[in-house]
Amino acid sequence: MNKKIISIEGNIGVGKSTFISILKKKWPNCDIVSEPVELWKDLTNDDNKNILQMFYEDINRWSYTFQNLACITRMMKIEDKINESNCEYIFLDRSLATDKHVFEKMLFENNNMNLIEHKMYNLWCDFYDKYVRNSKNYTYIYLKCDPNICLNRIKKRGRSEEESINLKYLEDLNKYHDEWLLNNENAIVIDCNESFEDDENKQLEFINLIINKLLVQNDNLDEFYKLKINKENENDNQKKIIKEKSL
């Protein structure tokens, strides 16, 4: 089976996890690759501080170490899931390309990583793209949100590893996401300034945007299965995606 990889992108606090949980419920024949945050949190020093905390507390010291770890653990999780899954659609909570075009690039250009570290990091990414899985073939869903709103959401969820995140950092991430994805022909941009967690209509609108993008990208419609939104239960107002072979 030729699996379609769709990566959910966006700033910290934009709502990627919520968006992915909605997709999991409403999208047939799909599997999810979560961001390897638990792996990062489990990697601790003698003071029981994990690498994520250490990175946010001292970005200059830990930038290369953390980006190298992020690169390797993303590769591991993506390839493990693709190899074990029988699903046609694989949704990623961020991709390897996110680090290359946003996080690592920003750290390097802000002088948090030196040139040698930058080149060493990109050796991994370039090898993966060339010999394993080319990220240019992905579809990207860019969840775009005002950095101030992202910061409020981060404070609300109260993760200890994120206590050091400030508005300037989120504004920089927003800029790099924009430069990478706003004019990317493989990307769909979705405005997430308003909460969509409990808005069924907005959720279905977002899913239809993804469906339309996949239809445009697909060259062989004879082998492509269209996805439609269909009301399954009128009383409960629940909707699901069903598949039917395109003509």
Label for each model-derived stretch:
Residues F19:
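Hydrophobic positions on the alpha1 helix immediately C-terminal to the Walker A/P-loop
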Residues K25-Q67, V102:
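Conserved substrate/cofactor phosphate-moiety recognition/catalytic segment
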Residues K100-K175:
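A glycine- and Lys/Arg-enriched "phosphate-lid" helix/loop adjacent to the NTP-binding pocket
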Residues I8:
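Hydrophobic anchor at the beta1->P-loop junction of P-loop NTPases
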Residues N11:
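P-loop (Walker A) phosphate-binding loop of NTP-binding proteins
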Residues K49-Y89, N111-N112:
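Conserved nucleotide-sensing/catalytic segment adjacent to the nucleotide-binding pocket
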Residues L151-L247:
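NTP-dependent small-molecule kinase module
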